[in-house]
Amino acid sequence: MTEQKNTNENDLQNGTSKADDDIRYQEVKPVNNKRSGLIGSAVAILVILAIGGGLYYYTTQQATKLRDPDHLLSDNENPGITCALIPTDVKGVEIGHRHFPLNVPFMNGPTRGKDVFVPIDFIIGGPKMAGQGWRMLVECLSVGRGITLPSNSTGGLKSAAMATGATLEF
């Protein structure tokens, strides 16, 4: 797991992988997840066939409802939501243009994937973390909200103070 962490940190820093921080879609709500992954073996390695197809993602296709009907990974036939870091050069991954709202660069953009073969080693935390995706996503969401909500409130307060001529000292 340490090797995966070191490799993924380097890939995230140089832009060859994208971190999973959101599972929003254009028309599909997270509770109605249409993506699924099927564990199978191809060329003697375990892979996940991520079946997507034309959905709009803010990050690469990484959260998928995993199925293992042949019990290649474990005794559990339906491990559940699983997160993986997928390099941007994997066949089947199409990266769109970055968002540019209000002329401010925003690092998220549309990414599409269809019939993407994902090695089992791409699962965040390794194969033992298959099915732990919902917990990971909720933990990441809570950390992000813990940062953005107070900072947005502080920014709003400063803007209001500036507009009304009030002075604030922090």
Curated annotation (Swiss-Prot):
Gene3D superfamilies: Butyryl-CoA Dehydrogenase, subunit A, domain 2, Butyryl-CoA Dehydrogenase, subunit A, domain 3. The keyword Cell membrane applies. GO terms for cellular component: plasma membrane. Residues 1-24 are annotated as: Disordered. GO terms for molecular function: oxidoreductase activity, acting on the CH-CH group of donors. It is found in: Cell membrane. It is a single-pass membrane protein. Keywords: Cell membrane, Membrane, Transmembrane, Transmembrane helix. InterPro entries: Acyl-CoA_Oxase/DH_mid-dom_sf, AcylCoA_DH/oxidase_NM_dom_sf. The chain crosses the membrane at residues 37-57. Its main location: membrane. Residues 1-17 have a biased composition (Polar residues). This is Protein HemX. The gene is hemX.
